Regions:
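Cytosolic regulatory and coupling regions of membrane transport/channel systems
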Residues: 31-234
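Pore- and pathway-forming membrane helices of multi-pass small-molecule/ion transporters and channels
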Residues: 1-29
Length: 234
């Protein structure tokens, strides 16, 4: 519109700019109204896929004696992708809440489940070098990888379920957890077995029940905001 200045009356470029802005706003509103929760579903699906990839990459690093200096930067990059997707989902949840979408509560629960999974997947016992040594002493490499691969496979299934509006099927990983708990008992002096058994049991519970472990008031800041007119008066 600036290039039109001098070639036509002053009000015409301003009018074109205003109409373009109005069109952009109306198009975005219509697009969001048409698809409603689908953008959030896509973000949640990507979040679960990234959690699966992060879980596999983390336990590959800890159980296959790879060089932490080479493996850690890509792992941290995956972790950052997870954090970015969590922020994106949080923003989209606020948009759905403002529009009183009927799928909001279910998608909020899926997001809370993702937060719990992220916490238990990303937690670490020590630095990678120490954990690698402890894992080797406990002879738990194969069993830990088995648990991690089971979790990752389930997360990918859930990602597709979220994206394509499917209800999740039944899930359990009792055999995998049983093998891990057996190693934890056999090597009681080694913290790796007990640490892995506890966190994988929490992950398995979330994946089985599809319910968050912890109560979170994610929309607390939204609830504190005043409507426009009361806010202006105050």
């Amino acid at each position: 519109t600036l290039s039109l200045a001098g070639n036509m009356p002053v009000w015409e470029p301003l009018l074109i700019y205003a109409l373009g802005t109005l069109w952009y706003g109306l198009f975005n509103w219509f697009w969001f109204w048409l698809w409603r929760e689908q953008p959030l579903r896509e973000s949640l699906s990507l979040l679960y896929v990234q959690l699966a990839e992060y879980c596999e990459a983390k336990y590959t690093l800890l159980t296959q004696h790879t060089d932490p200096e080479k493996s850690l930067p890509p792992l941290l990059a995956r972790q950052q992708k997870v954090v970015d997707l969590i922020s994106q989902c949080y923003q989209q949840l606020h948009m759905l809440a403002a529009n009183k979408n009927h799928e909001y509560k279910r998608l909020l629960r899926i997001f809370q489940v993702g937060l719990d999974l992220q916490e238990h997947i990303s937690v670490s016992l020590h630095n990678p070098e120490e954990v690698q040594k402890l894992v080797e002493r406990s002879h738990a490499e194969a069993v830990i990888r088995w648990n991690a691969q089971t979790v990752a496979a389930r997360l990918r299934v859930l990602a597709d379920d979220i994206l394509y509006h499917r209800y999740p099927t039944r899930f359990n990983m009792d055999k995998q957890l049983g093998a891990l708990e057996k190693i934890a008992r056999q090597h009681a002096e080694n913290p790796v077995g007990q640490f892995a058994a506890w966190h994988f049991s929490r992950i398995a519970r979330v994946l089985r029940t599809q319910r968050p472990l912890y109560a979170r008031d994610l929309m607390a800041d939204k609830q504190k905001r005043l409507p426009l007119l009361p806010a202006l008066k105050s």
